[in-house]
């Protein structure tokens, strides 16, 4: 595919080492799409409820959102090779301890305790994007690379839930999160070993200045949009498991989630290959508006096939939002703070997933899965409202 300005996806891999870090990053990113939904599925299989699993998944996601910017800040100071293996090891061990606690029926509070350090999982997407920036910073290929990364994210959310939910349903309840912990270690160690493409450590800046990055109004607004997106993701995951269970077809959740991500990946490939002439803020407003509209039909889903189709349609709005948000972030922040800034946007998604998973779990337990989609619709409205504010601010400036 060749974009109007961005270049072809194939050209990205002309640089030595690009394919290797992209592959390692894919493996290391799979767990973020596996652990949360795997926890929900695990408890649905073991206990038949979603409140505890949703709450534990929310603790993991919220911990991830809080801890991962600290990991990225350490990476900016000490380098990926020195930081990533330790962070991944702590996360994997904590996840394994949580699963062991489930297996041996320890008090629930200890599961939540383990869920906190499990969130030390590095933001691999930010690490890979930093490597692309090192290769193609200041060139049109960088936006194409960011588009590719958005698609890779979605492929992870196709493969990850399929593996996690499928294994937890077909093998044993803890199988999905267990595989996620293993892949996290393998992928992260492989990425850290690729030293030739590792971005160099940037000179230290003033500590006070580094803590104030969210004082940039546009970046803070982008993070809020990402929080709303995270709520949508949390609802989509949990409600899919609940809806298909209500329809006596729990394994079908994997197909619905896969098609949601497929829709996003498809639109991402198309959108990323054609760099439009309109301002990024306008593109963000249009993309979030599209998402808000496409989420509404989920309230009318009456069967698993219908839900699956609606998931694909709604998913088509996701990647354009993520691509534009990352590109806009790259444009507005200092180059030596790109990894941290991208991580904050990812952290926003994590906060949203935590809130969305917990809230929709409670809503579903009190009503039904269909009602849970109201949470997603409300979040879509929040996203487009905030994106509209970003666009208006940009025009006034």
Regions flagged by a language model, labelled:
Residues 89-105, 290-302:
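C-terminal ends and interior cores of transmembrane alpha-helices
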Residues 107, 169-182, 362-380:
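A membrane-interface helix-boundary motif in multi-pass transporters
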Residues 122-136, 240, 320-333:
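Intracellular juxtamembrane helix-capping segments at the cytosolic ends
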Residues 281-325:
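C-terminal transmembrane helical hairpin of 12-TM major facilitator-type secondary transporters
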Residues 336-367:
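A late C-terminal transmembrane helix in Major Facilitator Superfamily
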């Amino acid at each position: 595919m060749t974009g109007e300005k961005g270049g072809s996806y194939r050209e990205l891999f002309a640089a030595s080492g690009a394919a290797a870090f992209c592959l390692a990053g894919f493996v290391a990113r799979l767990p973020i799409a596996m652990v949360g939904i795997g926890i929900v599925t695990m408890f649905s299989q073991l206990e038949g409820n979603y409140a505890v699993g949703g709450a534990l998944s929310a603790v993991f996601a919220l911990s991830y959102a809080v801890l991962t910017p600290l990991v990225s800040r350490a990476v900016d100071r000490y380098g990926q090779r020195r930081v990533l293996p330790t962070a991944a090891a702590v996360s994997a061990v904590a996840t394994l301890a949580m699963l062991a606690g489930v297996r041996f029926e320890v008090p629930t509070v200890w599961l939540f305790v383990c869920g906190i350090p499990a969130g030390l999982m590095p933001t691999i997407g930010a690490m890979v994007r930093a490597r692309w920036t090192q290769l193609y910073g200041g060139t049109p290929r960088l936006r194409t690379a960011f588009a590719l990364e958005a698609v890779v994210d979605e492929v992870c959310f196709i493969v990850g839930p399929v593996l996690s939910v499928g294994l937890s349903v077909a093998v044993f309840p803890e199988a999905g999160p267990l595989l996620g912990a293993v892949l996290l270690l393998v992928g992260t160690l492989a990425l850290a070993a690729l030293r030739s493409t590792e971005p160099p450590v940037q000179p230290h800046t003033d500590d006070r200045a580094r803590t104030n990055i969210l004082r940039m109004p546009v970046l803070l607004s982008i993070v809020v949009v990402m929080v709303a997106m995270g709520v949508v993701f949390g609802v989509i995951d949990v409600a899919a498991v609940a809806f298909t269970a209500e329809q006596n077809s729990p394994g079908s959740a994997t197909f619905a989630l896969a098609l949601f991500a497929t829709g996003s990946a498809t639109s991402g490939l198309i959108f990323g290959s054609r760099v439009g002439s309109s301002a990024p803020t306008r593109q963000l407003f249009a993309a979030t508006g599209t998402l808000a509209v496409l989420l509404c039909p989920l309230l009318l889903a009456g069967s698993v096939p219908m839900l699956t189709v609606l998931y694909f349609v709604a998913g088509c709005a996701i990647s354009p939002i993520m691509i534009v948000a990352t590109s806009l972030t790259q444009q507005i922040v200092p180059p030596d703070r790109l990894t941290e800034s991208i991580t904050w946007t990812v952290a926003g998604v994590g906060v949203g997933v935590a809130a969305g998973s917990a809230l929709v779990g409670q809503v579903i337990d009190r009503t039904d899965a269909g009602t849970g989609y109201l949470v997603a619709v409300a979040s879509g409205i929040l996203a487009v409202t905030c994106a509209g504010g970003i666009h208006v601010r940009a025009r006034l400036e």
